[in-house]
Amino acid sequence: MGFRITPSRSESDEVTQVAPDIAVCPECLRDRKTQAQRLQYPFVNCAHCGPRFSIIRDLPYDRSRTTMSAFSMCPSCRKEYITVSDRRFHAEPVACNHCGPSYYALYNKVEVTDYSELLNLSSRLLREGEVIAAKGIGGYHLICDARNEKAVSRLREIKQRDGKPFAVLFRDIENIRRYVFSNGVEEKALLSWRRPIVLLKQLRPLAPSVNPGMETLGCMLPYMPLHSDWFERLDTPALVMTSGNISECPITIIPEEAEKQLAGKIPLLLHHNRKIHNRVDDSVLQVCGGQSCLIRRSRGYVPEPFFADVPVEGILAFGAEKVNTFALGKGETILQSQYIGDLKNWETFRFYKESLERFQHLFRFRPSLLVCDLHPDYLSSREAERYASDLHLPLLYVQHHHAHAAACMLEYGLDEPIVAFVLDGTGLGDDGKVWGGEIFLCDRREYKRLSHLEYVPLPGGDKASTEPWRMAVAYLWHYYGNEIPFPAGFKERVGEAKIQMLLKMMEKGVNTPYTSSAGRLFDAVSSCL
């Protein structure tokens, strides 16, 4: 008896497994200090770690079908690659200082390619309170010292980001424990090979602009050698690390794009020459009731499949519009895309369409049934309608909040009718109004609306979700009419002219749909406080 290792067969339609990107392992970090060809090498990896989904173009998963095809292995790496007993046996991204990708930067109009010099330069700039950018596994990040208020405020200006909190990369788990409360489940997630951002209750402050007004802090640990190299040269316990793009745009992956967006705003952009084929943001997780709940599923998780308990072959679900992901059905598995974002941004919509095509190609997917949101003006719904017309396929419209309820039923294996409380932002209802605070009697196929929050005006439509004071005025006007008992300081904070304009809009019914949204109720209450 024996076995043979043979070349990968070409194409198969039964593909559902592609590995997500994996944080660098301890063995590879050790190799950077002990192997001559990998001393301080920033792209070290093995069969147990390194880039996967971010570099793959096609299947089967061979180097020639990844962006590593641009780099020919040196004899030493080739020997590891073909040796069955080696940790780098058939590790497709295997590389070293002699043959692999490398970092480079243009600083003061001079190209710098020496990694040690780049490390010293970037560390000095971070120490001096500058904001820099660096290309990582799934895209560019913007980085600064998390203790330096001036640097973090400058980062907010660059990102055009008002109050949304930033994620923080900590030196190690001990420093995380100094700044936040964490339990065993949370630390297990932080230390896992997936390396997500984990939302934790803050214990000590960093710079105020990191997470203004928040009690939680998004924390993660180093997952690339570059991260560890910075902390070896810096005294700070933590760095702000946020996606390297202007707010609402997709994470940047191309050096020329990064330079166009950021040159002149920051002193240094660290590029590397390994192309990113599939952009992936950092994943975000929160532990609720002892269970890990993914808030944003991307790097480290995508494209791992979910297993359904019913056949889903051929279903292509296009997702919603605001925080979009889409999904493909293969057999009894569901393949969900990486986090896409808000499709109203043109660049994000282009990323969405590109990812739709790439997922279908990668997983040899041929749709037979299309599914989209009930809202006809969502760009995802319009894309679904285009597919239906071009491919002559049936299209099923699904009410937004029933989709939420059905997703929970699938996640928890529920197939009997349930009473579902769906508390959400917005979604078009069957009656043409904006739903979001619903009680359904439903199963996975059908639902009956038992009750809902009272309808109130939604002045300005979508604008009310970004200007919460509008909903405060709407609720107060709805219940008190023109004799509104505004909270102390509310008029001064918002402005009398704005309030009067909104009251006239609601009285005349101009751009004022009605909503039962729980999210807008929360907005109203928070704006009154």
Short names for language-model regions:
Residues 1-529:
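Short acidic/glycine-rich loops and adjacent helix/strand connectors
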